[in-house]
């Protein structure tokens, strides 16, 4: 299958992947190019920034969660019809599971999808040393698929010399540069970048970034690289017909500023299987929707809205009544926190929550676990 595509990667986290991926998407939209966007790995937040730029959902490509065929299926399904599919990598290019393998890394996604990779190189405090850095990444794997670099945080007066040096000594193309743009920096917190909605100037930042990239990055060259990507391997046709319910199943989906971490493909899969997803807001609605067969509480930042969630007594009561009555429910991350007795915010104040589950959630000041886990099927309670 012909599907133009590139993967934007870097040597490490914090090198500018998300910022430059969004800038490239914005520059393409400014040129009336129609991109589809993807994020390698399980990150919820970076796809929100992609969506802010292109106006449609961004999708996750995760070989640990979906397997190789699943990754290709998601790419094919959501990239078909776009002028180009732009994938944003995760962490360093080769960084995978447990920090000791390349499984589920950005490289793994490039390998599975046979996608050319363009590396963002953070040039702050770097000149000649850029060459051995690039060479190391090129030759670490025989099939590295790295076809070019974009130089980030580089002085314009250094660009010509850096471009020539890198192209002559490494043999790969330099597709442009981006200067230091402090006014376009994206702020972070413990789970990653702050959400796009939290900053009123997010769209202005992305517009300025897109305008700069149009001036200093070879968008036409990136499109040509994507056009020359090998044909995407076809999988056996996937179908949900065998598991589709005869009758529509109404499922309440908690969806507002406090609960906004979704995998778009999961929602679409539920709909394909016969679910009607009914959004409701634990922050602002008075009670859950009527005639539901189940409830979904995904993640987000309920701790930032703990007081508002706590004050919505009628919503908490309706949820607890439904769950005590046996309504099926999936709650993860922030959703799980909400169903507990209390959430403690960063000031130390405890706010009563739904109280269906015993326990409380509180901030620890730092991440305690980061990565994948494999669970054995069985009863969780009882």
Q: Where is each model-derived feature located?
A:
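Internal gly/pro-rich beta-alpha loop/helix module
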Residues: 128-243
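C-terminal and late-domain segments of enzyme folds
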Residues: 110, 215, 244-247, 259-271, ...
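ATP-dependent carboxylate-amine ligase catalytic core
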Residues: 2-19, 25-113, 121-148, 156-160
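A short helix->loop->beta-strand "cap" motif at the edges of active sites that frequently abuts
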Residues: 115, 172, 324-327
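Beta-strand->loop->alpha-helix junctions that form or flank phosphate-binding loops
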Residues: 39, 174-182, 276-284
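Residues that mark the start of a beta-strand
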Residues: 5, 33-36, 248-250, 276, ...
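Cysteine-nucleophile active-site neighborhood
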Residues: 302-381
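Phosphate-binding active sites in nucleotide-utilizing proteins
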Residues: 243, 248-313, 317-322
């Amino acid at each position: 299958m012909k599907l133009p595509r590139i993967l934007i990667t870097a040597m490490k986290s914090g090198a500018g992947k998300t910022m430059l991926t969004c800038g490239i998407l914005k520059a393409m939209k400014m040129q009336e190019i129609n991109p589809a966007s993807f994020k390698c790995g399980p990150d919820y937040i970076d796809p929100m920034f992609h969506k802010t730029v292109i106006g449609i959902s961004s999708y996750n490509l995760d070989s640990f969660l979906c397997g190789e065929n699943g990754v290709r299926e998601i790419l094919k399904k959501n990239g078909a019809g776009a002028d180009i599919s732009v994938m944003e990598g995760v962490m360093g290019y080769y960084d995978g599971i447990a920090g000791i393998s390349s499984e589920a890394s950005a490289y793994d996604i490039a390998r599975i999808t046979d996608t050319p990779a363009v590396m963002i190189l953070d040039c702050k405090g770097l000149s000649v040393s850029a060459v051995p850095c690039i060479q190391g990444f090129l030759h670490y794997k025989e099939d590295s698929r790295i076809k070019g670099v974009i130089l980030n945080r580089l002085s314009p007066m250094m660009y010509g010399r850096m471009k020539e040096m890198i192209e002559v000594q490494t043999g790969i193309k330099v597709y442009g540069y981006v200067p230091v743009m402090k006014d376009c920096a994206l702020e972070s917190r413990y789970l990653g970048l702050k959400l796009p909605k939290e900053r009123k100037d997010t769209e202005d930042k992305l517009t300025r970034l897109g305008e700069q990239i149009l001036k200093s990055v070879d968008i036409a060259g990136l499109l040509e690289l994507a056009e020359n990507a090998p044909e995407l391997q076809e999988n056996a046709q996937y179908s949900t017909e065998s598991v589709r319910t005869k009758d529509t199943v109404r499922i309440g989906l908690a969806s507002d500023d406090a609960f906004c971490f979704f995998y778009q493909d999961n929602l679409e899969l539920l709909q394909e299987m016969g679910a009607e997803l009914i959004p409701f807001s634990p922050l602002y609605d008075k009670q859950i929707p009527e005639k539901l067969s189940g409830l979904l509480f995904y993640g987000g930042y309920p701790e930032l809205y703990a007081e508002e969630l706590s004050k919505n007594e009628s919503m908490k009561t309706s949820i607890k009544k439904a769950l005590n009555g046996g309504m099926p429910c999936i709650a993860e991350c922030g959703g799980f926190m909400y169903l507990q007795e209390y959430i403690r915010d960063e000031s130390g104040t405890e706010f009563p929550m739904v109280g269906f589950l015993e326990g409380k959630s509180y901030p620890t000041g730092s991440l305690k676990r980061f990565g994948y886990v494999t669970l054995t099927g069985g009863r969780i309670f009882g």
